[in-house]
Amino acid sequence: MAKEFGRPQRVAQEMQKEIALILQREIKDPRLGMMTTVSGVEMSRDLAYAKVYVTFLNDKDEDAVKAGIKALQEASGFIRSLLGKAMRLRIVPELTFFYDNSLVEGMRMSNLVTSVVKHDEERRVNPDDSKEG
């Protein structure tokens, strides 16, 4: 039976905290002027690769999001070196940054559900308006 919370998950969780601190305190790139949040980290089983999922505070502008991801990719070597100092790992994983749109999609879905519920309540209050011919 497989472990439910193995070493890759524990390392990913700790790495998420450390990368968030590094982005907050060490990275001074003007392309990352917007607040960056690390929403998740997925580790490979051999701990050699990490997918880092980030969100940005002002993520309405698609060009700014692309520039932010590009800036993070370019700074990945620096972030990796700081991770090596902060965490005791034999191999510091290669970092790949991705934009996490799950928060935006979740808010969109929530708004859709809210509008459907509101429309349904309006139909219950005024049933004559919704009858057709």
UniProtKB/Swiss-Prot annotation:
Listed GO CC annotations: cytosol
Compartment annotation: Cytoplasm
Domain of life, source organism: Bacteria
Matching InterPro entries: KH_dom-like_a/b (IPR015946), RbfA (IPR000238), RbfA_dom_sf (IPR023799), Ribosome-bd_factorA_CS (IPR020053)
Molecular function GO terms recorded: ribosomal small subunit binding
Gene3D superfamilies per record: 3.30.300.20
GO biological-process terms attached to the record: maturation of SSU-rRNA
UniProt keywords, alphabetically: Cytoplasm, Ribosome biogenesis
PANTHER family: RIBOSOME-BINDING FACTOR A, CHLOROPLASTIC-RELATED
Subunit organization: Monomer. Binds 30S ribosomal subunits, but not 50S ribosomal subunits or 70S ribosomes.
General function of this protein: One of several proteins that assist in the late maturation steps of the functional core of the 30S ribosomal subunit. Associates with free 30S ribosomal subunits (but not with 30S subunits that are part of 70S ribosomes or polysomes). Required for efficient processing of 16S rRNA. May interact with the 5'-terminal helix region of 16S rRNA.
Family: Belongs to the RbfA family.
Cross-referenced NCBIfam families: rbfA
Protein name: Ribosome-binding factor A
Organism for this UniProt entry: Escherichia coli O127:H6 (strain E2348/69 / EPEC)
Gene: rbfA
